[in-house]
Regions:
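Short beta-strand segments
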Residues: 1, 16, 113
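Conserved beta-loop-beta element that borders a ligand/cofactor-binding pocket
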Residues: 1-2, 41
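Alpha/beta catalytic cores of group-transfer enzymes, especially the acyltransferase/condensing modules
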Residues: 5-6, 101
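A short glycine-threonine-serine/GTX helix/turn-capping micro-motif
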Residues: 49-60, 109
Length: 152
């Protein structure tokens, strides 16, 4: 299951192979898939449903995040164009920082959060019991269920 960032060679593809596929065939497949980004392999084909939910559909979640950030910025008085430019650059730059850093995402989040500051205040809302984590839990579970249904 590839994802759409493959269009700019920044994708990630998760693949599985039947036991009868030779090591040479698997290697060739890996080389072809690497042309559009990272490649991971799973032995258990049942994992393809959660993979689809997380990374196959994941770009849409990021794009929705950008839309939501830009809309919130516009509601605070920024022009829609400026709000979108800020949201796009923030998500793109944060993604690149995450990619280049050896620190986990949680530590990068802590690094940008000053105690009692603006980020801390926003994170209180986003990390509340009814915040972003339960929404993602439900969304990915729904996508995984739908992937199973579509697979028959």
């Amino acid at each position: 299951m590839p994802n759409t960032p493959a269009a700019v060679r920044q994708g990630i593809t998760v693949a599985t192979a039947a036991p009868e596929v030779s090591a040479a065939e698997k290697k060739r497949c890996h080389e072809l898939l690497e042309a559009v980004g990272q490649v991971l392999w799973v032995d258990d084909e049942a994992l393809m449903d959660p993979v689809t939910a997380l990374s196959g559909s994941g770009p849409a979640y990021v794009f929705l995040l950008v839309e939501a950030m830009a809309a919130a910025g516009a509601k605070l008085g920024l022009t829609p164009e400026m709000a979108m430019q800020l949201a796009r650059a923030t998500v793109s730059g944060s993604g690149e920082l995450l990619k280049q850093s050896s620190e986990p995402a949680a530590q990068l989040r802590v690094n940008v959060t000053s105690p009692g500051g603006t980020t801390a205040e926003a994170l209180k809302v986003l990390m509340a019991a009814d915040g972003i984590q339960p929404v993602f839990d439900k969304a990915l579970a729904a996508a995984s269920r739908r992937s199973k249904e579509l697979a028959g």
